[in-house]
UniProtKB/Swiss-Prot annotation:
Belongs to the Hfq family. GO terms for cellular component: cytosol. Homohexamer. Keywords: RNA-binding, Stress response. This is RNA-binding protein Hfq. The keyword Transcription regulation does not apply. Transmembrane segments: none annotated. RNA chaperone that binds small regulatory RNA (sRNAs) and mRNAs to facilitate mRNA translational regulation in response to envelope stress, environmental stress and changes in metabolite concentrations. Also binds with high specificity to tRNAs. GO terms for biological process: regulation of DNA-templated transcription; regulation of RNA stability; regulation of translation, ncRNA-mediated. It comes from Baumannia cicadellinicola subsp. Homalodisca coagulata. Residues 9-68 form the Sm domain. The keyword RNA-binding applies. CDD domains: Hfq. One of its GO terms (molecular function) is RNA binding.
Length: 86
């Protein structure tokens, strides 16, 4: 994955661009909800009624409110990494 964008960046960018509501679960069990306003290598800015800067090292899971096809516009960057070992 050295070439182009990382899978993480592609996924977060789709969520940001399409303003998809997300639930972000932190390692300490806290659940944050909103849409991703921006992100960089270290943080995600989540907006709901307020903006919150969340450090990525504290994030356990990001759950979109609807299906996200993060390969749709980036199929040339990645082969199928679905875990199939055929």
């Amino acid at each position: 994955m050295a070439q182009g964008q990382s899978l993480q960046d592609i996924f977060l960018n789709v969520l940001r661009r399409e303003r998809i509501q997300v639930s972000i679960y932190l390692f300490n069990g806290i659940k944050l909800q909103g849409h991703i306003e921006s992100f960089d290598q270290f943080v995600i800015v989540l907006k709901n009624t307020i903006s919150q800067m969340v450090y990525k090292h504290a994030v356990s899971t990001i759950v979109p409110s609807k299906f996200v096809s993060h390969y749709a516009n980036n199929s040339s960057n990645y082969s199928n990494h679905s875990g199939d070992r055929n």
